[in-house]
Amino acid sequence: MGQSNLGSVIEDHALERVPDGERENWLVISWNTVGLITTLVILFFGALVCFVAGVRIALLAGLLSFAVGSGLAFGLARIAVETGHSNTLITRKYGLGTRGSALASVIFGFLIVGFLAVENALLYRGFLFFFDLADNWSSRLLVYGSMTIAWIALTAWGFGVVTRTSSVMTVGFFAVLAWMVGHMLLVGGGEGELLFARRLDAGTLSAMGITSNVDKFVFAFNLLVGPACALALNTADFGRYGKSTGHVTAAAMIAIGMQSLVIMLIGGILMQAAAPTMVEWLAATRGIPSEEAGRQLLQSPDSIAATFILFGGVAGFALMILAQAKAQVLNNYSSSLCIANLFDALFRWRPGRLAFVVLANVIALAMLYGKILHFVEDWSKLLGVL
């Protein structure tokens, strides 16, 4: 009996309906949805749209992103509650059929496993920066190996452990983030920075094809709505445990609002306050002119991790861990459900969800080795447009 219960916990109803007796309220589900979007990548997207469009235009784009994502989330919430299935399994049983569901699993799986890979890379470079490690195979095996084991161990035990992990880390994230925001605004410029206009010069914007306020709005919306809609799809993976459509919709809307407005704004404000110091640091450490350092500041989410560590030291490093670790557990969880549906739909192969937890991490590591992570951001924006 004990082995049967353990197997059931690990399998976590991956390819079946979640029983009514295991359903949870909006708060429990919110720990997972909010945990997914409180990450360095979302903070980076926020900084990018604020620097390109300015805070006011970015907020308008965020409002539209919130509306679109919430509408999609409401529809998926209702379906998830009534069916009790994950998002890709829903497409197989109630929409696209077996082949269509397999295609949906490939599309969604590339995005979610891609984020698993991207955020692994962010954590890796954060470890290198904080501990002053060399980027060699020893460091890669140690850091990537340790992280992969941690994600598998925390994801293997199903919804309950995933939710508890996310709740603890989300509370810690917001506590440390509040301290960091106050500290960086105090050091970097204070309240005068809150509603800044675009920071990039006209020449840089023109090279990006952005020549008007409409272009700025479109750029900001495309970058924000992709993660918002991806989060709406994730709603089914966690919402299948919801007690009602209202509970699941509330959990999704809280998270999408945080992603499209709050975390976006915080990312912009933090990087605006930190920009002068970061430009000086980049120019000094890389031996490049200040103008070039300013352009490099927003070329990669690495800048967010470096900013936190430079300004916050141990607290900044802790914030990076809290932001990324919970998201990795949640990404791994959704990835395992998606891949389980893919293999069941195509090959009728059901080795158990744990096998797909491991496979998702293997694919993420392969993405890192293949250096294809730049496709993930483009894919996110493309999904937003579609």
Labelled PLM ranges:
Residues 1-59, 177-180, 187, 207-221, ...:
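Membrane-interface "cap" regions at the ends of multi-pass membrane proteins
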Residues 18-26, 157-170, 230-265, 280-289, ...:
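Hydrophobic, small-residue-rich membrane helices and short re-entrant helix-turn-helix hairpins
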Residues 41-56, 79-80, 118-127, 152-161, ...:
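Transmembrane helix-loop junctions in multi-pass membrane proteins
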Residues 63-96, 105-111, 117-120:
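Juxtamembrane transmembrane-helix boundary signature
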Residues 101-135, 321-341:
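Hydrophobic transmembrane alpha-helices that form the core helical bundles
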Residues 124, 142, 146-190, 196, ...:
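Membrane-interface loop-to-helix entry segments
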Residues 139-146, 341-373:
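Loop-to-transmembrane helix boundary motifs in multi-pass membrane proteins
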Residues 172-206, 220, 227, 267-276:
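Hydrophobic alpha-helical segments and their helix-loop junctions in multi-pass secondary transporters
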